A protein has these predicted regions:
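Short beta->alpha linker loops
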Residues: 58-62, 83, 137
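Generic beta-structure capping elements
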Residues: 6-9, 82
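Short amphipathic alpha-helical/adjacent loop interface patches that line ligand
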Residues: 40, 138-139
Length: 140
C-alpha cells in the first residue's frame, strides 16, 4: 500500500501572511489563491496512472479545492474535520502585531515557557491545540 500526503495549494491566508498584514490562520476556512489552484492542477498528471482507492481530506475549503483539482474523477472520499490543521484558538483570525502588544497575551510572545507555542509539540495558543493534541485527534 502506498500513502500519498498532499498539502493544500497556496491559500488566501498564506498569501496574506507573505504580502499583507500577518495574521494567524489555523482552522479559518479560507480558499485557494490562483497560484494555489495552479499548483494543485500541476499535481493532477502525476496521479493519472496511479490507482487511488480512497481519499481522506479535511472539511476546509482550501483542502477540498486542492482535492477537486487533482482528482476530478470519482474516488471514494472521506471528508472529515479530524484532518484539519492545528487550531490556534483565540489567535485565529487575529493580526500578529496586535496580539503581541496585548498584555493579556504577553507571555505567548515573551515568556520562554510559552512563546514556542507555534512550533512546540506541547505548547498551544489559548483555547487552541498543541501538536500533541493534533496527533491524538488525527489518530481517531
Amino acid at each position: 500500500m502506498n500513502l500519498y500526503l498532499i498539502r493544500h495549494g497556496e491559500s488566501q491566508s498564506n498569501y496574506d501572511n507573505k504580502y499583507n498584514r500577518a495574521y494567524y490562520c489555523g482552522q479559518l476556512d479560507v480558499p485557494l489563491t490562483e497560484k494555489g489552484v495552479e499548483s494543485a492542477k500541476q499535481l493532477k498528471p502525476y496521479f493519472y496512472n496511479i490507482k487511488i482507492n480512497d481519499v481522506y481530506v479535511s472539511d476546509l475549503t482550501r483542502t477540498k479545492e486542492t482535492y477537486q483539482y487533482i482528482f476530478p474523477y470519482d474516488i471514494p472520499t472521506t471528508v472529515t474535520s479530524l484532518l484539519r490543521e492545528r487550531s490556534l484558538g483565540l489567535f485565529e483570525g487575529q493580526f500578529k502585531d496586535k496580539l503581541m502588544k496585548n498584555n493579556m497575551y504577553h507571555r505567548y510572545f515573551h515568556d520562554p515557557n510559552y512563546k514556542d507555542f507555534r512550533h512546540s509539540f506541547i505548547q498551544k495558543a489559548p483555547e487552541g491545540e498543541s501538536y500533541n493534541d493534533v496527533y491524538y485527534r488525527v489518530k481517531q
